Amino acid sequence: MKKDMKFLIGLVTAILITGVASAQHGNAPAGHVTLGVKGGVNMYNIQNDNNISYDQRTGYYLGLLGHIHRNNHWAFQPELVFSAQGAKNHNLDYINIPVLLQYMFDNGFRIQAGPQVGFLISSDNDNDYNPIDLALSVGVSYVVPSTGFGIDLRYNHGLSDINKSSDVKSTNRGIQLGLFYLFGHNSKIVLR
């Protein structure tokens, strides 16, 4: 598991970094790539079929992102993020890889949605939880024009059963609120 996770993290990092060429100014063409960092607050809980109530876990997330323009309004945004999830007294820490399709409005606002795969890296009891968590992410963000700084609000809706020790299906559900910075936001970085 750890060997596979190291390979996957390395692969995603290589994809985000390789192929970056020259910086130019102007509108972003297809293939324009911007790298960034992000971090913020998580508010997560576990939802299950038996409606057992869990107290919310407030944690944090921290990660890297790649912003790949398809044209002036559409982009893909793959990310590599550490995320503290689960619920109070049920700590589940993941490395998440969301791949979002993003629509960019001319005023700096963006809407986004896409799948996310999470790899459990630590928990209170590893034997009780599945190592992979699939989710759907939807959200909005705002980039301050010509600065690269932005704010992001996202909802992550767990799709897969995180509980492997019971017949009761349990999923992660959470809201993330945070800040991000896109390096070289004023310039184009074109893939060759």
Residue ranges of predicted features:
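Outer-membrane beta-barrel channels and translocator barrels
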Residues: A30, H69-H73, D106, P145-T147, ...
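Cleavable N-terminal export/targeting peptides
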Residues: M1-G31, G184-R192
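Transmembrane beta-strands of outer-membrane beta-barrel proteins
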Residues: V33-V37, F76-P78, I111-P115, F149-L153, ...
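Predominantly the C-terminal beta-signal and adjacent terminal strand-loop region
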Residues: H25, P131-R192
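Transmembrane beta-strands of outer-membrane beta-barrel pores
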Residues: V41-N45, F82-G86, V117-I121, V144-S146, ...
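Glycine- and aromatic-enriched membrane insertion/assembly motifs of diderm outer-membrane
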Residues: T34, N51-Y94
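Residues that define the transmembrane beta-barrel architecture of outer-membrane proteins
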Residues: G31-V33, Y54-Y60, N91-I95, N130-L136, ...
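Short glycine/proline- and aromatic-enriched beta-strand/turn motifs that initiate or cap beta-hairpins
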Residues: Q24-H67, R192
